[in-house]
């Protein structure tokens, strides 16, 4: 099979290809109000997945996530896309049951490439303990792949992205820098060892982090993907709460700051930052690349959890025991709708 650089076939890679939050907000406001009492989570809080109660003991959790290639290797594109799709289920505190493939694929590419992508997705689903039961394919000018994932959760144990509580600590379970580094990889300027580290972060499931999150109990949680750390934090806060985050406490993939300094950002970073600026207060002097880094779109990023001070130590300890990063990056405040960024 002839080597094809998948990232060269697309204008925007991975979760950086998401529609801008501003445009999405304009579109979603036209959707009708949901009045079904069994619809426990819908579009109103921009949460990670839909949740529908089917009994007093069970609710279905359903998500769909797909994107353009974030790496050139077809197999690892499949692996990363599947991990990213599963993440929404984990972020809700649910257990995945099965998945369906969602595929857009150009006619000009050999079908063996698609078969390899699907194998990557199936292997990652197998690691998560679920089968892939089918899917849907369309001809497309740019390759796209992802999954619909169905999970289950007790209706009383859903972990939502809102509301957190003032005084909660913010815990992040993966380092940032995926968007800037994958953009550099697309341009061919990222060293092989750095690219390998990015791939390892993206292909890691959030299952262990979710297990601890459910066991300990948190106020709110979400996964960090296309809207960046600041964007998904703002969804957690909405207009009711605020947050303080500390730049020096935010973990980054080795090499990420170097490429941030070169302004190797996907377009989505600027879109995210511009949308959020009215809600941001940078306490002191911050370089543009530092601001963009916090809005950098992540593909298969970590979980962001708001946890009470009483449970924080237990959460961090148990995450670390599972080999999961547990970086305390900030705190929830009562400063409505404002994110204060400090050093």
From Swiss-Prot:
Amino-acid positions noted as binding Mg(2+) in the UniProt annotation, renumbered to this chain: 48, 88, 223
Keyword ATP-binding: yes
Cofactor(s) recorded in Swiss-Prot or TrEMBL: Mg(2+)
Site-annotated residues for Important for catalytic activity: 18
Positions annotated to bind ATP: 18, 45-47, 65, 88, 135-137
Catalysed reactions, as listed in the record: hydrogenselenide + ATP + H2O = selenophosphate + AMP + phosphate + 2 H(+)
A Pfam family the protein falls into: AIRS
EC numbers for this chain: 2.7.9.3
GO terms of biological process kind: selenocysteine biosynthetic process
Entry keywords, A to Z: ATP-binding, Kinase, Magnesium, Metal-binding, Nucleotide-binding, Selenium, Selenocysteine, Transferase
Function according to Swiss-Prot or TrEMBL: Synthesizes selenophosphate from selenide and ATP.
Subunit and interaction comment: Homodimer.
Designated name of the protein: Selenide, water dikinase
Gene: selD
């Amino acid at each position: 099979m002839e080597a094809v650089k998948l990232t060269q076939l697309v204008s925007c890679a991975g979760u950086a290809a998401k529609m801008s939050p501003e445009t999405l907000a304009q579109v979603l406001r036209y959707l009708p109000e949901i009045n079904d009492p069994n619809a426990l989570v819908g579009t109103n809080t921009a949460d990670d997945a839909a949740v529908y109660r089917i009994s007093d003991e069970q609710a279905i959790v359903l998500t769909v996530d797909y994107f353009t290639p974030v790496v050139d290797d077809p197999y690892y594109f499949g692996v990363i896309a599947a991990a990213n799709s599963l993440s929404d289920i984990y972020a809700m505190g649910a257990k995945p049951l099965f998945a369906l493939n969602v595929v857009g694929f150009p006619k000009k590419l050999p079908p063996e490439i698609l078969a390899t992508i699907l194998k990557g997705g199936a292997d990652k689903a197998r690691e998560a303990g679920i089968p892939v039961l089918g899917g849907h394919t369309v001809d497309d000018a740019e390759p796209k792949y992802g999954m619909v994932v169905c999970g289950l959760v007790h209706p009383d144990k859903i972990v939502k992205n809102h509301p957190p509580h003032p005084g909660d600590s913010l815990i992040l379970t993966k380092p940032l820098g995926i968007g800037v580094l994958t953009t550099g990889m697309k341009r061919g300027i990222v060293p092989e060892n750095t690219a390998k580290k990015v791939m390892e972060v993206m292909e890691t499931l959030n299952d262990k982090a979710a297990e601890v999150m459910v066991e300990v109990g948190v106020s709110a949680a979400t996964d960090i993907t296309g809207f960046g750390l600041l964007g998904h934090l703002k969804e957690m806060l909405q207009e009711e709460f605020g947050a303080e985050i500390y730049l020096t406490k935010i973990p980054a993939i080795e090499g990420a700051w170097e490429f941030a300094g070169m302004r190797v950002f996907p377009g989505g970073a600027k879109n995210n930052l511009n949308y959020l600026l009215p809600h941001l207060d940078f306490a002191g002097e911050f370089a543009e690349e530092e601001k963009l880094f916090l809005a950098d779109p992540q593909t298969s990023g970590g979980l962001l959890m708001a946890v009470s001070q009483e449970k924080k130590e237990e959460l961090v300890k148990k995450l670390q025991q599972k080999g999961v990063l547990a970086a305390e990056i900030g705190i929830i405040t009562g400063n409505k709708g404002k994110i204060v960024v400090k050093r």
